[in-house]
From Swiss-Prot:
This is Glycerol-3-phosphate dehydrogenase [NAD(P)+]. It is found in: Cytoplasm. Its EC number is 1.1.1.94. GO terms for cellular component: cytosol. The active site is at residue 190. It comes from Rhodopseudomonas palustris (strain BisB5).
Amino acid sequence: MSAFNSISVLGGGAWGTALALTAARAGRSVTLWEHDPGHAQHLEQTRESRFLPGVMLEPSIKVTRDLAEAARAEALLLVVPAQVLRSVATSLQPLIAARTPLIACAKGIEHGTHRFMTEIIAECAPNAIPAILSGPSFAADVARGLPTAVTIAASDAAIAQALAQAMNSGSFRPYHSTDVRGVELGGATKNVMAIAAGIVAGRKLGASALAAMTTRGFVELVRFGKAYGARIETMHGLSGLGDLTMCCSTPQSRNFSFGMALGRGESIDEAAHGKLAEGYYTAPVLLEMAQAKGVEMPISTAVAAILQGQLGVDAAIEGLLTRPLKAEE
């Protein structure tokens, strides 16, 4: 079994920079690929990320715009948005060695196809081993070496364990799992719940309402997870409950801050600040997938209706509060 001594990180944004630093701290030989020439040059010359001011790249991290060079690593972290993962995985297919792990680090579901991230990798790069990294982790915390725990999942237990070992450092603790679907499902679902929680906070509905929204959001996550084959222990773990708890409690979460802005009465364009949160794309897809399995998800339904302009925030909240009373699950 490979020790994955060389790791490439594809994507030089905040999360990619944080994971590159983590891999370097874990003693790996790290290459950081960035497609934007201006940002790549800035990283190479200043060693400082525009997205994480004050955070400097380790001297050992090599910055490149050459995808073929990055593809020579023993494992690749794909730190690109969920909706562009397909194009990156397709480009990698002819460049990677057989059975190279491609680890998705985005939390989402592809719009239009309803594909999870590892499904896209399997489809577009059949030579690769699909894997997923997810859990409660903000880029700024990880980059600064603050204690963080995540989950890395692959269908092969030995591969998952080896990848976790390769990324393990004094402050970054990966747990390993073979429940690939459960790990990526939790990360995608919490995006939508975090928007809902942000709306509650932005509307100043109080701590009680926020706690209720987060708890019932977790109920929806579990329902959806069961319908799509996730293990209950995964949903109760870092990539499920852990990520949900974090992202429903702080504006550090882009989805939560997006929801807060909506709750304050801002339009979607105003709330996005030039970059839509991943939950915006996930909400309608999540709802379609839930309906296909007959899963009741009232919070997700309300969020999707708000984002599609079908309901105002107050009407959506009233709709949730006036649903028929029922026994707690």
